[in-house]
Curated annotation (Swiss-Prot):
The species this protein was found in: Staphylococcus carnosus (strain TM300)
Family assignment from sequence similarity: Belongs to the universal ribosomal protein uS19 family.
Protein name: Small ribosomal subunit protein uS19
Biological role stated in the UniProt entry: Protein S19 forms a complex with S13 that binds strongly to the 16S ribosomal RNA.
InterPro entries, per database record: Ribosomal_uS19, Ribosomal_uS19_bac-type, Ribosomal_uS19_CS, Ribosomal_uS19_SF
Key words, A-Z: Ribonucleoprotein, Ribosomal protein, RNA-binding, rRNA-binding
Taxonomy, superkingdom: Bacteria
PANTHER family xref list: RIBOSOMAL PROTEIN S19P FAMILY MEMBER (PTHR11880), SMALL RIBOSOMAL SUBUNIT PROTEIN US19M (PTHR11880:SF8)
Gene for this chain: rpsS
Species lineage: Bacteria, Bacillati, Bacillota, Bacilli, Bacillales
One protein family per Pfam: Ribosomal_S19
Length: 92
């Protein structure tokens, strides 16, 4: 179920303050965040976020296509190693 339109998109206040502080700077630094639930706004374009995936911070460079999505969508939490190989096939 999608979020109600009357509520509007969600962004953590501490993350929004960091983005607004960086808008005036010429030098763009990486913003480290644990807020995977925050929605990407148009003023986030061109900023690199380090989104926490439970183990490390994954760098996510925000582009135009990402607006409206959540930051956590671009930092996968699970790594798929592949299915177990059947030893019977390799022995023949």
């Amino acid at each position: 179920m999608a979020r109600s339109i009357k509520k509007g998109p969600f962004v953590d206040n501490h993350l929004m303050k960091k983005v607004e502080a960086q808008e005036g700077n010429q030098k763009k630094t990486v913003i480290k965040t644990w807020s995977r639930r925050s929605t990407i706004f148009p003023n986030f374009i061109g900023i690199t976020f380090a989104v926490y995936d439970g183990r490390k911070h994954v760098p996510v460079y925000v582009t135009e296509d990402m607006v409206g999505h959540k930051l956590g969508e671009f930092a996968p939490t699970r790594t798929f190693k592949g299915h177990a190989v059947d030893d019977k096939k390799t022995r023949r």
